[in-house]
Amino acid sequence: MPRLTRRRALTAAAALASGAGAGAGAQAAAAPGAAAHDHGSPDVPLPCSLLDLLPLLPLLLDEVIKGRGIQGGPHRGGGHHHGTGYAVFLDGVELHVMRNADGSWISVVSHYDPVPTPRAAARAAVDELQGAKLVPFPAN
């Protein structure tokens, strides 16, 4: 996975925003009544402008802790969870994180130690691993 930086995030956001505007116009022209019946299908791009993505910048994670590269950000779909989640990568390997009902976060490495943010979960995993490599977590 390429290194996630703010520049890449903003570039992707700009491309997504310009593509969402073009796609929404074509979709409305093709089916005028379809927009009124949309119930948030995951195929419909959510952000309509770059300004809509600015609140997500603090959620982007790209840092080095104790020599380990940590990247992460909001992620749609994948795994057995529904809706929008958060993906965290430790040295390019996905660290499975999950949000609890109370808003705290856990990871597959520090499952019994909930923390307030995905960033804190990644940092706790780095501490727990003590330099060991993260083994990919199987999907099934």
Swiss-Prot record:
Predicted to be exported by the Tat system. The position of the signal peptide cleavage has not been experimentally proven. The keyword ATP-binding does not apply. InterPro entries: GriE/MELC1_sf (IPR023199), MelC1 (IPR010928), TAT_signal (IPR006311). GO terms for biological process: melanin biosynthetic process. Gene3D superfamilies: protein ne1242 domain like. The keyword Cytoplasm does not apply. Residues 1-36 form the signal peptide. Keywords: Copper, Melanin biosynthesis, Signal. GO terms for molecular function: copper ion binding. Belongs to the melC1 family. This protein may function to deliver copper to tyrosinase. This is Tyrosinase cofactor. It comes from Streptomyces lincolnensis. The lineage of its organism: Bacteria, Bacillati, Actinomycetota, Actinomycetes, Kitasatosporales. The gene is melC1.
